[in-house]
């Protein structure tokens, strides 16, 4: 997490401006198909990328399946998918399994920035939460050492009654990120209503006056309210791009795409060209459109060099 914040501080002046993002040029038409299996968080963005990509390459077909980031590494290892979108970086054990099979690591691309959001029903009057309080709401362990278990909104001075928890299942990279950063590796409470996707978490909280949940910002709707977060009581920050980049908002993260690229070999034309499109102005505009944040222009050349 510290590494991500330091990196973002170095590039914050470049990401805000679209200058440096090059228009996509389809110099050679490509045909063929590929499969993408992985992150639910990236599911909609993958579909939007494909929709525009097909305007340049009409015969290309890419199947997209978003059942959680943990489904991506096995799919890439077994070659049931050529594109593996993930809302977290691969774990060491996942990288080890890939290398055991192929003798080299998978290639990682950082395709977007996200702010993981904690949200409540739109009528909840809450003004903000510390990470300690969020941990005490969601975790049975309270590794951040908050003074008490928060199972009732009255404990935060909000007259709503029992807290109703919504979250993702363990196949989700968002689940893993939240567990690692907010809960400091602690365990979720057993009464969290686990949902199959981020949209379901948002839907559940939107109709539950006592609800609280989490997801990437791309799934946020007007039916719920994002809770500003902070490390200290009274110092809360929203999910603005500026706050993510300067590290004040504590839950910023990269979104990733992994591929199987043997050293000194080229990817299939469909996969390579699709990745080139993602890092173009058109591709990164779709990131904006889907509610996320584009990657810094300063890193795009380095990401594209991984294709060589």
Indicate residue ranges for each PLM-predicted region.
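Sec-dependent N-terminal signal peptides
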Residues: 4-12
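Flexible loop/hinge segments at secondary-structure junctions
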Residues: 18-308
């Amino acid at each position: 997490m510290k590494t991500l914040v330091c990196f973002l501080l170095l590039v914050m002046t470049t990401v805000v401006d679209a200058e440096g993002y090059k228009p996509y040029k389809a110099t050679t038409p490509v045909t063929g198909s590929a499969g993408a299996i992985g992150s639910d968080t990236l599911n909609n963005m993958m579909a939007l990328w494909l929709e525009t990509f097909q305007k340049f390459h009409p015969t290309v077909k890419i199947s997209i399946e978003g059942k959680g980031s943990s489904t991506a590494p096995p799919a890439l290892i077994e070659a049931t998918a050529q594109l593996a979108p993930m809302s977290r970086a691969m774990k060491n054990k996942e990288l080890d399994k890939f290398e055991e099979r192929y003798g080299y690591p998978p290639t990682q691309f950082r395709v977007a920035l996200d702010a993981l959001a904690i949200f409540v029903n739109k009528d909840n009057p809450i003004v903000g939460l510390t990470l300690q309080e969020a941990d005490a709401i969601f975790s049975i362990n309270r590794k951040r050492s908050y003074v008490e278990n928060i199972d009732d909104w009255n404990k935060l001075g909000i007259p709503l009654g029992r807290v109703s928890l919504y979250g993702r299942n363990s196949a989700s990279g968002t689940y893993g990120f939240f567990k690692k950063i907010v809960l400091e590796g602690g365990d979720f409470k057993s009464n969290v209503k686990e949902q199959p996707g981020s949209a379901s978490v948002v839907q559940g909280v939107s109709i539950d006056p006592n609800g609280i949940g989490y997801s990437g910002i791309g799934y946020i709707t007007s039916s719920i309210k994002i809770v500003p977060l902070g490390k200290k009581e009274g110092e809360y920050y929203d999910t603005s791009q500026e706050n993510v980049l300067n590290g004040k908002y504590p839950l910023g993260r990269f979104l990733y795409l992994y591929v199987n690229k043997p050293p000194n070999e080229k990817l299939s034309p469909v996969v390579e060209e699709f990745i080139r499109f993602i890092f173009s102005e058109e591709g990164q505009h779709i990131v904006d459109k889907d509610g996320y944040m584009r990657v810094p222009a300063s890193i795009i050349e380095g990401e594209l060099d991984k294709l060589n």
